[in-house]
């Protein structure tokens, strides 16, 4: 029940506007690396010193105007340049709705290609985040178009979707770099597993499918059972460490992140920054409602 409440709140535009004005003091600092690229760089440097790599994400989705989409696109280019300038072990992640997908596919494609051009210039990899199901087909279509132009481009497949395995198979000709996740949006039972067990079993089958195809696989999870499954799979099939990595979110299980890195696994931390943090934060609380305590602490400190 709480999960559905927080997912509903994540889509509330009034609350998003209020939270943006109030700042990350509402407990979000645990999960967000600050408002600026400078704060994100500082965070990633600290992670790199601990043996962790990163993917930087400028928070924002559902751009309501070309001006907003243009601003996010420019910030993405700025982030790429910062990654190169500071020699960070980091990639860039972005959401297509943040660069205008809801306004027009042409606008989003134009911005994405411009961002990828800068990324290619600085040799920085980029991952297109997957959003809710209403944007699923467009995201895969745009990924297919741009993957052929930019080799170091990845995208995300959500394990809670019934169709995920078929979509991975359809992409094999692209040799896709995929981040596999459980999925964090509220979706209908018509398209997504409604229960954790179904999602987890499907997640394991997707990891196996992607890894055994020989394509790069990022297993994005905080679940020890999924981590254990992946470790056993790569050991059994002698899959090289260069073909996969684990990913976790900034602020969640930081000690486990360090443990995996010390064990010799490539461990990437998803590092978001920016003022448009509310929707992201609500989805993190929906995944683990106990995190709501940090909201209360943030308010009580005022």
UniProtKB/Swiss-Prot annotation:
Temperature dependence, free-text field: Optimum temperature is 25 degrees Celsius. Loses 70% of activity upon activation at 45 degrees Celsius for 15 minutes.
Pfam families xrefs: Pro_dh
Positions of the catalytic residues: 129, 179
Recorded catalytic activity of this chain's protein: L-proline + a quinone = (S)-1-pyrroline-5-carboxylate + a quinol + H(+)
Binding site for FAD: 130, 158, 182-184, 221-222
Residues marked Critical for catalytic activity (site): 270
SUPFAM superfamilies: FAD-linked oxidoreductase
Keyword Disulfide bond: no
Known pathway: Amino-acid degradation; L-proline degradation into L-glutamate; L-glutamate from L-proline: step 1/2
Cofactor (UniProt): FAD
Keywords tagged on the record: FAD, Flavoprotein, Nucleotide-binding, Oxidoreductase, Proline metabolism
pH dependence: Optimum pH is 7.5-8.
GO BP: proline catabolic process to glutamate
GO MF annotation, one: FAD binding
EC number per UniProt: 1.5.5.2
Amino acids binding substrate: 95, 283-284
Enzyme class: oxidoreductase
UniProt KW Manganese keyword: no
Role noted for this protein: Converts proline to delta-1-pyrroline-5-carboxylate.
Family the UniProt entry places it in: Belongs to the proline oxidase family.
UniProt protein name: Proline dehydrogenase 1
Organism: Bacillus subtilis subsp. natto
Organism placement in taxonomy: Bacteria, Bacillati, Bacillota, Bacilli, Bacillales
């Amino acid at each position: 029940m709480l999960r559905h409440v927080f997912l509903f709140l994540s889509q509330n535009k009034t609350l998003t506007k209020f939270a943006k004005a109030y700042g990350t003091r509402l407990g979000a600092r645990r999960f967000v690396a600050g408002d600026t690229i400078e704060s994100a760089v500082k965070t990633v440097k600290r992670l790199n010193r601990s043996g962790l790599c990163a993917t930087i994400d400028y928070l924002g989705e559902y751009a309501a105007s070309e001006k907003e989409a243009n601003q996010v696109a420019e910030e993405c280019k700025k982030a790429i340049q910062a990654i190169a300038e500071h020699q960070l072990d980091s990639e860039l992640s972005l959401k297509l709705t943040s660069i205008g997908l809801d306004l027009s596919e042409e606008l989003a494609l134009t911005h994405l290609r411009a961002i990828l051009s800068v990324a290619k210039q600085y040799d920085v990899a980029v991952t297109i985040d997957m959003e809710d199901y209403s944007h699923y087909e467009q995201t895969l279509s745009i990924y297919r178009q741009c993957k052929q132009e930019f080799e170091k481009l990845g995208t995300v497949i959500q394990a809670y979707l019934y169709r995920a395995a078929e979509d991975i198979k359809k992409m094999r000709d692209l040799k896709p770099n995929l981040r596999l996740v459980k999925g964090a949006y509220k979706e209908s039972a018509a398209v997504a597993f409604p229960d954790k067990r179904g999602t987890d079993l499907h997640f394991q089958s997707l990891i196996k499918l992607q890894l055994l195809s020989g394509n790069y696989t990022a297993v994005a999870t905080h679940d020890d059972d999924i981590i254990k499954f992946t470790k056993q799979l790569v050991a059994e099939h002698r899959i090289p460490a260069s073909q996969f990595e684990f990913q976790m979110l900034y602020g969640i299980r930081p000690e486990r992140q360090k443990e995996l890195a010390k064990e010799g696994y490539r461990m990437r931390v998803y590092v978001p920054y920016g003022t448009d943090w509310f929707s992201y934060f609500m989805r993190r609380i929906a995944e683990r409602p106990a995190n709501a305590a940090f909201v209360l602490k943030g308010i009580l400190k005022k």
